[in-house]
């Protein structure tokens, strides 16, 4: 089982399933719930006080503009947008007229944004985020020495998985520490035994190990930068 939503028809997961004659089920172990404007106000956040916004995900984009609308805040055309990736920057078009706006983006990792913060150091930045924030983000922003404020605009919560028989699966694949938490919350009596566990990212690995779970498959690595590559390599190793 892959703890993500079902992918499109062209997904590498579906290609692996067909090629290796295995069955892959998709089920998100976590989901996002937005905070309301009342809760945002308790964080002492006034959207009009900021001249720049830092977006690290599409969820952050959606919930920022949702709350802006709820609070009747008209986002000014002069707002500067710093996006972690080009995909997130392009996603802004869902909410704003992209042309003529002050939009910049990095390659992939948050640390890649450091030159942009040095280029635009005088903005007062708002960071819309979930209740879980990577320490890399805090470290990069503090290194950049810019004026920034975090606003928790949505929360990552455990989904209800009680309709699943978790023991039916030979392998479970996780992409976040919250996914591991959801496993424990939904299946408090889960015993790993012969169940193989795959994880993506060091923080997910750490969460699994902390929960006493043995990890059999890890990505990204130099050889397997994606989970699908790691999974295919693992399956092929079983045939040897």
List the model feature ranges, each with a label.
Residues 1-240:
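Conserved beta-alpha
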């Amino acid at each position: 089982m892959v703890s993500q939503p079902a992918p499109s028809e062209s997904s590498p997961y579906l290609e692996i399933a067909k090629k290796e004659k295995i069955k892959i089920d998709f089920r998100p172990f976590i989901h996002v719930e937005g905070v309301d404007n009342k809760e945002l106000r308790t964080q002492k956040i006034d959207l009009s006080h900021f001249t720049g916004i830092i977006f690290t995900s599409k969820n952050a984009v959606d919930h920022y503009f949702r709350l802006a609308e709820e609070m009747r805040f008209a986002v000014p055309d002069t707002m500067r947008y710093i996006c972690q990736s080009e995909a997130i920057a392009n996603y802004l078009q869902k909410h704003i007229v992209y042309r003529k706006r002050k939009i910049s983006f990095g390659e992939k990792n948050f640390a890649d944004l450091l030159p942009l913060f040095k280029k635009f150091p005088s903005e007062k930045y708002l960071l819309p985020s979930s209740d879980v924030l990577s320490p890399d983000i805090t470290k990069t922003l503090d290194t950049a020495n810019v004026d920034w404020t975090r606003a928790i605009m949505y929360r990552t919560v455990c989904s209800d998985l009680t309709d699943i028989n978790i023991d039916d699966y030979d392998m479970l694949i996780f992409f976040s520490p919250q996914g591991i938490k959801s496993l424990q919350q939904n299946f408090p009596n889960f015993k790993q035994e012969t169940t193989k566990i795959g994880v993506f990212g060091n923080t997910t690995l750490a969460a699994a190990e902390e929960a006493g779970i043995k990890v059999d498959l890890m990505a990204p690595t130099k050889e397997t930068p994606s989970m699908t590559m790691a999974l295919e390599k693992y399956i092929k190793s079983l045939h040897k």
